[in-house]
Amino acid sequence: MSKDNKKAGIEPKVFFPPLIIVGILCWLTVRDLDASNEVINAVFSYVTNVWGWAFEWYMVIMFGGWFWLVFGRYAKKRLGDEKPEFSTASWIFMMFASCTSAAVLFWGSIEIYYYISSPPFGMEGYSAPAKEIGLAYSLFHWGPLPWATYSFLSVAFAYFFFVRKMEVIRPSSTLTPLVGEKHVNGLFGTVVDNFYLVALILAMGTSLGLATPLVTECIQYLFGIPHTLQLDAIIISCWILLNAICVAFGLQKGVKIASDVRTYLSFLMLGWVFIVGGASFIVNYFTDSVGTLLMYMPRMLFYTDPIGKGGFPQAWTVFYWAWWVIYAIQMSIFLARISKGRTVRELCLGMVSGLTAGTWLIWTILGGNTLQLIDQNILNIPQLIDQYGVPRAIIETWAALPLSTATMWGFFILCFIATVTLINACSYTLAMSTCRSMKEGAEPPLLVRIGWSVLVGIIGIILLALGGLKPIQTAIIAGGCPLFFVNIMVTLSFIKDAKVHWKDCSPYTQKMTH
């Protein structure tokens, strides 16, 4: 075996432990679901109620850091010596497609119902103030604030990979300027990487858990095929197969094509909902919600409700911030990989403006449509959820539109492709992170990429078959706590190294390889 091939091989200490840990967690969870639910819910309650303030301050501080990057002395620094690998349009499309999935369509269609039925700030459910703040909170949770945290970390990873010419692309390797090479190559670095990989694998399982029943309900609506475990397994297997085909063509071809198709189809479906779902109301509702967001944003940023104890910030804001934290490193590594040649300012502005526009578009159109269906008594969403579950309620919000069969076909295809692009990005990053070394411009071995997608698919099928996905989904949020600290360390390491290297290229001018 050649030296290069050997360097591209699997790193056992970060490849096998996550698989073993995930297997043990699955076994412990499904061994006694009732007991597991009690333990996991208790942990979730403890994290969100006792440490919720930490997630809120994290988001605020990272948002301030984004302004520092955009307007500071590093704004014009280029992340790599070559021209951008992708056109600006394809670059934004790839970011949008890889950072969203059927989970976005899931929450975009139903989230507003939860906000208006159990609103924050002591408001009465289904009241006018509750409906006014409903979309505003969605714009808050899926707006500039979280995307800014991703752009900061993306700059950090792009800096270490393309400017500092690092051969390893996983979280621990970026911490050399902060903790030293000895600790990075020792137990500390191994623990950091394994925390990251375990959280990523479980997060992908959660995404499959949201997407699979949504697609299954589409199939039941279109073909009358009942929801079974066999159908779940077939759907996940198809996703894994399509992902294997995509990665076989490499990052440039496979991901770009899937991302472009997903993005164009998203705009097509959203345009249809916008036109037939009441364009005038949706635009007016969005405009009013932006004003509501600006009015309430200071309180939203720091809302923990310790006096009223209504539970809204714990159930939603802290939950979403923890969700963003879990995906931050994984997505930032991928976003850094496709942002080679961009300036710091270009990456920060491109991510926040482009991705915020995309998520705001989705939540405004889908949320506005759902609100109208509730107001006009076309759908009884609480009854649908009680009798059939949340996925059926979401399907009915789409089926209520004109040309329901054609609409459902479009929604089915969109959910399917959206999840393929997410799995594609995740499996690619998993492969990069579990190889011994990655040189600039190189891609992880094909078999490793396909192998990760297959293994994650198997985990998803097992979780669905055993019925243990729901407690695992809750455990992911609590499990995001270690990544909270890892994200902070990566950020501090970047700031420390850039302060020296981008000033006079000394003393860290030597190539950092681990």
Curated annotation (Swiss-Prot):
Q: Which NCBIfam families match?
A: bcct (TIGR00842), PRK03356.1 (NF002887)
Question: Which residues form each disulfide bond in the chain?
Answer: none
Instruction: Identify this protein by name.
Output: L-carnitine/gamma-butyrobetaine antiporter
Residues carrying the site annotation Important for substrate binding and transport mechanism: R262
Q: What does this protein do?
A: Catalyzes the exchange of L-carnitine for gamma-butyrobetaine.
Report the GO terms under cellular component: plasma membrane
Into which family does the record put it? Belongs to the BCCT transporter (TC 2.A.15) family. CaiT subfamily.
Give the catalytic activity. Answer: 4-(trimethylamino)butanoate(in) + (R)-carnitine(out) = 4-(trimethylamino)butanoate(out) + (R)-carnitine(in)
Q: What is its main location?
A: membrane
The record ties this protein, via InterPro entries, to: BCCT_CS (IPR018093), BCCT_transptr (IPR000060), BCCT_transptr_CaiT (IPR023449)
User: Per its UniProt entry, which superkingdom is the organism in?
Assistant: Bacteria
The way this protein sits in the membrane is described as: Multi-pass membrane protein
Q: Which gene encodes it?
A: caiT
Q: Which GO terms describe its biological process?
A: 4-(trimethylammonio)butanoate transport; carnitine metabolic process
Activity-pH dependence = Optimum pH is 7.
Taken from the record's topology, the Cytoplasmic segments are: 1-11, 69-91, 155-185, 250-251, 336-347, 435-445, 493-514
Q: Which GO terms describe its molecular function?
A: (R)-carnitine:4-(trimethylammonio)butanoate antiporter activity
Q: Name one Pfam family in it.
A: BCCT
Transmembrane stretches, start-end: 12-30, 43-68, 92-112, 132-154, 186-216, 231-249, 252-277, 312-335, 348-369, 405-434, 446-464, 469-492
Q: Which UniProt keywords apply?
A: Antiport, Cell inner membrane, Cell membrane, Membrane, Transmembrane, Transmembrane helix, Transport
